[in-house]
Amino acid sequence: MNPRSPFSIAILLTLPVVLLSACWQRGSRTPAEAKARLAAAVAARDPSRLWNALDLDTQWSWMTALRAGREAYDITLSNLPEGQLRERMIRRFQPAATSENAAELFAKSLAVDLWPSLAGQIAAASDRAPTQNAAGSEAEIVWPAGRLLFRKASQSAFGWGFAGLAAEAEALKRTASADLEALRTNAADYERAAARGSR
């Protein structure tokens, strides 16, 4: 067996470090780092950086909404007859259908007043560090008028993220999923009606 070259040994020694760094690209190592990441995104008013600052559950909700919206758009085009309802549904699902990924859909959907709202929360939190709960799954900074909430993903590789937009994302996911189920039912009804009409 040929002995390993110094070059190959160096690669093997550095590979775990590279893999570890890649794992931490989603989420932050600590709640304090997650807060800093959020603050930087808000200061820059950068939707992409804000997306990367979110906790994993919030991102998953947007990913689910994206998938549901795309399928709903396809069903609308394929099955709904011409008319006002079809046009309304096309407009409703078009943002998801034309988004390359969930981050882009998130960016399209940001309310204008979100940036000043988040900036105000970060200013109110000042330089205080987030306090973790006993389970180590959440951390928060609380003041009389509000709080900043951070969550750690159950998958250790994904780290901490800002969870202050989680409730809105969950509501969006539920609505998108309900819309999709309703459209699936309607599409089946249209198909049965068309089949009867062709007899």
Regions found by a protein language model. Name each.
Residues 2-11:
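Bacterial N-terminal signal peptides that target proteins for export
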Residues 20-22:
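C-terminal motif of bacterial Sec signal peptides marking the signal peptidase cleavage site
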Residues 37-50:
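Short helix-adjacent coil turns
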Residues 24-26:
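Bacterial signal peptide processing site
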Residues 14-18:
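Hydrophobic membrane-insertion alpha-helices, especially the h-region
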Residues 32, 47, 52-132:
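Short solvent-exposed beta->alpha transition segments
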Residues 28-32, 44, 177, 184:
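Amphipathic alpha-helical repeat elements characteristic of tetratricopeptide repeat
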Residues 104, 113-123, 129, 136-192:
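Short beta-strand edge/turn micro-motifs at domain boundaries
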